[in-house]
Amino acid sequence: MYFTEEHEVFRESFKDFLQKEVVPHIDKWEKTGNIDRFIWRKFGDMGYFGLSYPEEYGGLNLDIFYMVIFLEELQKINSGGFAAAIWAHVYLAMTHVNVEGDVRIKNKYLGASISGEKIGCLCITEPFGGSDVAGMRTTAIRKENSYVIN
């Protein structure tokens, strides 16, 4: 089995957190289409947004199995909207900042995203590609002090 005793302790702790802090609000959030701001900070305070991110930005730099547990338990609360919002923040937005951002960008946004102070998203669309990031056809070519977008 891939999961250690530490992983299972994390699983139980995260399940308890979700039941106490998230589940009581799900119906309201689903009905209004808005997730209260306080929960983002609570996720950050508990370290959940930083599981796999570098320690120098406030992350915990843990192995991938913590992320697997995080996603498994998040899905079990039966709120696709909430799970998608958290997933988009942690994986779509923050991953790009972590992988592609220079130190200045990481200092400004990655730590604030890990703490829950800022909420990330990834907004991309093309006429024929929709939101399929891998299928993007637009290019940006640097020409002197600007870019040519095609």
Question: Residue ranges of each PLM-predicted region?
Answer:
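Glycine-rich flavin
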Residues: 23-150
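A ubiquitous short alpha-helical element
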Residues: 8-12, 77-80
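Intrinsic disorder at enzyme termini
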Residues: 1-6
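Residue-level signal for inorganic ion chemistry
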Residues: 7, 18, 102
